[in-house]
Amino acid sequence: MRLLILLTAIFFLGKTTVFSQDKKITKTGQIIFEASVPSFEEVKASNQAVSCIINTKTGEIASLVLMRGFHFKVALMEEHFNENFIESDKFPKAIFKGTIKDFNLANIDSKGTKFNVNGTLTLHGISKEIAVIVLIKKSGNDLELISNFNLDPKEFNINIPKIIKPKMAETVQVQVNFLLK
């Protein structure tokens, strides 16, 4: 009987290990966004607690960002961002779900491979199809995902007050850096 229990436990633990090898995950990903313009105060924030998961067999990718996790140099900017622009109480998170086109783990090395990613970004209650380019590198058994792209706040019904518009860029530059284990 003990042997049967032991063999069953080994079988299920083995299956869990096999399944977990199909996914790479992080809960400490980094997203930085910037909407600065010359001659005005820097409009830049970072979030160091972004979650992301990649299915290494299918190329499916999903990411979750808690909006209150973005931190600015100036506390007042952070307050305005959460209360007036992104409305974090009403829209507490942004979610991306997509697919890495032609993803093949075997083709990725430490120098990295560029891939096209297509998916849906839900931000401020609005879902939009987006396409971005990502660089994916192997780092030991881990994957590093790097991307830079632009977003237009108007496309997500994020209203910038007229008094602030001249002090912010019309498009927001987004930098993504995830180390998935």
Map each language-model feature to its residues.
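Bacterial Sec-dependent N-terminal signal peptides
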Residues: 1-24
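Low-complexity, acidic/polar, glycine-enriched regions of mature
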Residues: 20-181
